[in-house]
Amino acid sequence: MTELKFVFGDPRICSGCTTCSNTCSMFYYKVISPSRARNRVLRIEPALDFPLFCRNCEDAPCIDACPEQALMRTSKGIVIVNNKKCVGHGECVKACPYYAIRIHPDTGKAFKCIQCGECVERCPADAIFMTTEKDLAERDKDGSMRALYEQHRDEIYDKEEDSP
């Protein structure tokens, strides 16, 4: 099986401009609204920005966590939410190790990045890119990106708890 590509944002490069979130909400909902974006940028003060996206985990815990079986994988390997089945329990949100699923402020249902790539095209810092786990490991040979995520994991989680 071919290794699945996913959208990823490098916090070492991200400027926190939120062009990715604004692009996403405009593309899908025709409004600039970070709370409606399928991705997000979390700021850890004073100025460290973490762009967060779904990684379509091979063994996706969000799929198993949903009591309604509302999350599934497409034939291309993308994890999606079936809005007809989702009732907004939020178990998938809690299960996601990348804080990439949240409850939509209008529908009350889970939503997430579906890897359309609109944000990749528009990131002015080139901090967002399509990658694979193998390529990402190669890009982070020195471990500095992983170290940032590990160092700020609790802060990212706390920020997520406060997000809509």
Q: Predicted regions span which residues?
A:
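Conserved active-site region of classical short-chain dehydrogenase/reductase
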Residues: S15-T18, G117
